[in-house]
């Protein structure tokens, strides 16, 4: 069995640790922050932007790959690796199920928030709840 050491306890580190464990690795995660501060900047997030071709449970309307790509070009000023960006955009369409499997809950779309409810899925309880769900899942 491989051993994996993950340094940090934010969203990316927790996802890496959980995925390594799912792949059969023995995982050690090191987080220097005390429990009430763990998670780094991830505790300040509130949502996930994800591609979807049709309305879904917590996402209204559609947010197709090409529109997501065009939005990414706007915010990066066109300085981005298209291959990696599109790979990430496509993968975003399936990550909510994986997140739910690890205890993340999403809130239903809010009325009057159509512009963001179309592109973003909001975490119930925000980033702190996201991080805590991943820690609970990792401790199982």
Please give the residue ranges for each predicted region:
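Aromatic pocket-lining residues of Rossmann-like dinucleotide-binding sites
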Residues: 20
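Generic hydrophobic/aromatic pocket-lining and core-packing "Φ" positions
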Residues: 16-17, 96
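Catalytic-loop motifs flanking and including active-site residues across diverse enzymes
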Residues: 12-13, 130
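Conserved N-terminal/central alpha/beta ligand/cofactor-binding core
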Residues: 32-140
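Beta1/beta-strand and adjacent pyrophosphate-binding region of the FAD-binding site
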Residues: 1-12, 28
């Amino acid at each position: 069995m491989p051993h994996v050491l993950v340094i940090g306890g934010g969203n990316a580190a927790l996802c890496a640790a959980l995925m390594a464990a799912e792949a059969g690795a023995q995982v050690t995660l090191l987080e220097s922050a005390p429990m009430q501060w763990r998670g780094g900047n991830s505790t300040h997030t509130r949502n996930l932007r994800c591609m979807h071709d049709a309305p879904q449970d917590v996402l209204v309307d559609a947010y197709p790959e090409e529109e997501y790509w065009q939005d990414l070009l706007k915010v990066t000023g066109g300085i981005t690796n298209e291959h990696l960006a599109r790979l990430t955009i496509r993968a975003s369409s399936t990550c909510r199920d994986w997140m739910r499997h690890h205890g993340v809950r999403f809130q239903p779309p809010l009325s009057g928030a159509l512009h963001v409810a179309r592109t973003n899925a909001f975490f119930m309880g925000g980033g702190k709840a996201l991080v805590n769900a991943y820690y609970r899942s990792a401790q199982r």
